[in-house]
């Protein structure tokens, strides 16, 4: 089994999951926690100070689970169209509050003006371009010095997009340092093929019990990482891919609006 991220901001859930399944999960398999405004909304946290305080708690928890300070918490910018300099200040705030506990991954949108700021972000945090729903945009992002890109197969498959082929194509074309995170997983099968495709999957609350049903966990442990080449041409990119990414950021921007206002007031 390779590394994974907990896809939740619910500390109590992470603690109970490790208590229940910790004997089967090696501590260093837990890469960390990934969150976004939707994850914070599910635990009724909408204000910036709540996000900052919770980031510290998550960093402390991941440090305890792993027994080191090499774990990661990934926090999304509260609004996708923030000026890159504002996102950088936000990244510094989160990095300061988690100093000595863990690394911080800043989840940023795939917009050109933000991508051009990646070198500045990298001086302070790990960089993770999120909300990707097509192979072309994903590969464009990989030309920048990013630590991660996050593809959203669960959401892609809900609208009939072949996420597995898209991820395999990106992996076979990406020769840089950028790792692929597979997020928004809906089923254990998606998690299994995400491991098979040599990505770092995120595992949300709904999937954990199912992972330990039947032979699912054994299948994950026995996976030989790799995949068959999918050919020299990118999977077809349609309006569905574009609409899905736009809908993702529209949802996150709405849920992060309170934190955005708090951040802008704090930096004014």
Language-model regions, residue ranges each:
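Conserved anion-binding
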Residues: 98, 109-118, 122-179, 185-190
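Active-site beta->alpha loop and helix N-cap motifs at the rims of alpha/beta catalytic domains
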Residues: 2-21, 27-119, 123, 153
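Catalytic cores of alpha/beta
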Residues: 12-25, 89-90, 116-117, 134-144, ...
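Structural recognition of alpha->loop->beta junctions
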Residues: 22-29, 94-104, 123-124, 143-148, ...
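Glycine-rich phosphate-binding active-site loops on the catalytic face of alpha/beta enzymes
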Residues: 32-33, 37-41, 131, 147-159, ...
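Alpha-helix N-cap and loop-to-helix initiation/capping positions
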Residues: 46-54, 82-86, 133, 158-166, ...
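C-terminal alpha-helical cap/extension of soluble enzyme domains
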Residues: 177-268
């Amino acid at each position: 089994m390779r590394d994974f991220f907990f896809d939740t901001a619910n500390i109590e859930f992470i603690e109970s999951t490790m208590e229940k399944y910790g004997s089967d999960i090696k501590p260093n398999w837990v890469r960390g926690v990934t969150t976004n405004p939707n994850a914070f909304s599910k635990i009724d946290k909408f204000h910036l100070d709540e996000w900052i305080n919770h980031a510290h708690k998550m960093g402390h928890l991941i440090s305890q689970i792993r027994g080191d300070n090499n774990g990661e918490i990934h926090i999304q910018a509260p609004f996708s169209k923030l000026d890159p300099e504002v996102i950088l200040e936000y990244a510094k705030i989160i990095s300061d509050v988690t100093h000595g506990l863990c690394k911080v991954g800043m989840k940023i949108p795939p917009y050109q003006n933000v991508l051009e700021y990646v070198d500045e972000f990298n001086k302070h945090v790990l960089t993770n371009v999120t909300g990707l729903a097509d192979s072309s945009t994903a590969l464009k992002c990989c030309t920048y010095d990013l630590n991660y890109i996050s593809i959203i197969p669960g959401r892609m498959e809900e609208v009939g997009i072949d996420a597995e082929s898209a991820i395999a194509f990106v992996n076979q074309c990406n020769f840089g340092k950028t790792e692929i995170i597979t997020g928004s997983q809906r089923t254990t099968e998606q998690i299994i093929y995400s491991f098979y495709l040599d990505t770092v999957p995120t595992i949300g609350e709904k999937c954990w019990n199912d992972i330990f049903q039947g032979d699912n966990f054994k299948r994950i442990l026995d996976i030989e990482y790799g995949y068959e080449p999918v050919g020299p041409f990118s999977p077809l990119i349609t309006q569905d891919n574009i609409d899905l990414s736009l809908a993702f950021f529209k949802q996150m921007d709405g849920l992060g609006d309170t934190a955005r206002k708090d951040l802008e007031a704090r930096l004014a």
